[in-house]
């Protein structure tokens, strides 16, 4: 339903480039020494699925000290996350209401995108990148120059898109927002239940606790 609503608004737009709708396009980093065993989650290509879906089994971390020094790549609620290189270039997700983490950053393989006043909706931006035509166009750009696909900032910013009138984007945002927040809430609750299961199951199997 959400994609249908998006397309009704999107295909009524005027020709533009993705950069026209962005206030921020940045990637992050990890220390040269590699990932930490714990600390602040550092989102990479291995984690990105789509909004509401995230692979927590492949989590990597950066230290709290490194996180505090970051001037780019810090994730905020409403940020759109784009996998920018490798076999799955173009996969897109979104951070919202503590999903996938209340505090996290991205590594050098992920772009953070934030909309500007011409497209004042992170939800609109997410569905724009989820659109099959735009995903294919990004992947084609990434695959055109090397054996290992990859996108640079210029290739992302110059992606041809359609840009509807601001009031149409705001109307779409108001309509879709309750559904998006509910998806984030459900995802966070599912993670809590999974964590509880993983904590209790070994204790049940060992007899440390009983269901009686």
Residue ranges of model-derived segments:
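Short glycine-enriched, charge-decorated loop/helix-capping segments at active-site entrances
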Residues: 59-61
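Non-catalytic DNA-recognition/assembly elements of restriction-modification systems
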Residues: 1-29, 158, 162-212
């Amino acid at each position: 339903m959400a994609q249908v609503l998006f397309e009704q608004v999107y295909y009524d737009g005027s020709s533009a480039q993705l950069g026209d709708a962005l206030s921020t396009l940045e990637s992050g980093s990890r220390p040269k020494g590699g990932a930490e065993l714990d600390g602040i989650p550092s989102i990479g290509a291995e984690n990105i699925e789509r909004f509401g879906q995230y692979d927590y089994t492949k989590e990597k971390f950066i230290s709290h000290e490194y996180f505090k020094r970051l001037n780019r790549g810090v994730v905020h609620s409403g940020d759109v996350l784009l996998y920018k290189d490798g076999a799955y270039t173009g996969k897109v997700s979104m951070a919202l209401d503590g999903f996938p983490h209340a505090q996290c950053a991205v590594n050098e393989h992920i772009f953070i995108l934030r909309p500007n006043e011409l497209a004042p909706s992170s939800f609109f931006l997410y569905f724009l990148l989820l659109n099959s035509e735009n995903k294919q166009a990004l992947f084609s750009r990434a695959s055109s120059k090397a054996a290992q696909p990859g996108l640079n900032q210029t290739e992302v910013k110059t992606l041809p898109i359609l840009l509807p009138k601001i009031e149409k984007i705001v109307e779409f945002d108001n309509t879709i927002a309750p559904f998006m927040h509910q998806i984030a809430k459900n995802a966070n609750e599912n993670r809590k239940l999974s964590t509880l299961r993983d904590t209790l199951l070994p204790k049940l199997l060992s007899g440390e606790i009983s269901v009686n």
